[in-house]
Design a protein with these regions (language model features):
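Helix-loop-beta segment of a Rossmann-like dinucleotide-binding subdomain
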Residues: 1-2, 27-30, 35-73, 94, ...
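Dinucleotide-binding Rossmann-like beta1-alpha1 core, especially the glycine-rich loop
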Residues: 1-39, 166
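A short, glycine/Asx- and small/polar-enriched loop/turn
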Residues: 8-11, 39-46, 87-94, 229-235, ...
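C-terminal lid/capping helical subdomain adjacent to the catalytic/cofactor pocket in oxidative enzymes
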Residues: 30, 235-281
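Short loop/edge segments at beta-strand edges and connector loops
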Residues: 32-33, 79-81, 219
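Helical element adjacent to the flavin cofactor pocket in flavoenzyme catalytic cores
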Residues: 49-109, 266, 275
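Active-site substrate-recognition segment that forms the wall
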Residues: 91, 103-109, 113-246
Length: 281
């Protein structure tokens, strides 16, 4: 559920509802304050809505399943093999691959889905127009875990701020509860946990869960968002480019695939497959 903690956030809820209708999500249900209190007694909110088709998954299990399907269809996972350079040629896209056994390979198809490194990979390949490659920025998100039994029955999201989703409640398949992520900029790919963020977490969470006790939060983990817009700029949607944008046949670049990239991964995969199929016609 998504909750507004005061009247000023009602416009945000209406915006979500309108976007859901545009995207074909037709099962959102607006909830009154009394209905919210019945569903989530620990949550204090002004209004909100329920998304009954939302669920949770084992993300690592999903990735292993993806890998198994890929390998069953002839793919290989090759780790520690960075793309160090390349060029667009008449025969295809030549990639210089580093690692323990450096090699040069010519590819008919390159799908650049390297997360934080996607703009870096594109810039390393001569022939990919620089004007089509976004800048890359680094933003870290911290997660804290809740000690003891979770008081929540659903995933709980506050109305988002301009550039991120806010500190929300996630419950995993084991019933464990975590809060996060927050949002702060970093100059490089730096996963260090900043314990000084703790006070801000308590403040943000208590806006909708005032029963949070001192000392109930424990440091969890961090994640880095592959941002393509910088500080002071409004967040943008995923950027997926094929030859109609950058002019390189056989290449699809995926930039800024942060949350909800995992949620969208199957749909993104189908879309990229369609782009490649259309390019080959």
């Amino acid at each position: 559920m998504i909750v507004a903690t005061d009247e000023s956030q009602l416009e945000g809820l209406k915006k979500y509802q309108k976007q859901a209708e545009i995207n074909g999500v037709d099962d959102l249900r607006m909830l009154s304050r009394d209905e919210l209190a019945e569903l989530e007694p620990a949550v204090v909110s002004f209004a909100g809505f329920m998304s009954p088709s939302t669920g949770i998954i084992d993300s690592h299990g999903l990735m292993l399943a993806y890998l198994g399907d890929a390998e069953n269809n002839g793919a290989s996972l090759v780790l520690n093999s960075p793309v160090t350079g390349g060029a667009v040629t008449a025969d295809g896209i030549q990639l210089e691959v580093g690692g323990a056994d450096p090699m040069s390979i010519v590819c008919k198809t390159v799908i650049n889905s390297a997360g934080h490194g996607a703009p870096i990979v594109s810039r390393a390949i001569t022939g990919v127009p620089a004007a089509t490659i976004p800048a890359n920025y680094y933003a870290i998100g911290h997660y804290y875990t809740l000690t003891g039994k979770t008081p929540f029955n659903h995933l709980v999201y506050p109305v988002a701020r301009q550039d991120w989703l806010g500190v929300h409640v996630t419950i995993d398949l084991g019933g464990r509860c975590k809060f996060g992520p927050d949002f702060s900029w970093r100059d490089s790919l730096d996963y260090r946990f900043d314990q000084s963020r703790e006070a801000r977490f308590y403040e943000a969470i208590r806006r909708y869960y005032p029963g949070l006790k001192d000392g109930a939060l424990q440091p969890g983990y961090t994640g880095m968002r592959p941002r393509i817009t910088g500080q002071g700029q409004e967040a943008v949607d995923f950027v997926i480019q094929d030859h109609t944008v950058h002019g390189v046949h056989g290449m699809v670049n995926l930039y800024g695939i942060e949350s909800p990239g995992l949620t969208s991964s199957l749909a993104i995969g189908r879309y990229v497959g369609e782009l490649i199929a259309n390019d080959r016609r």
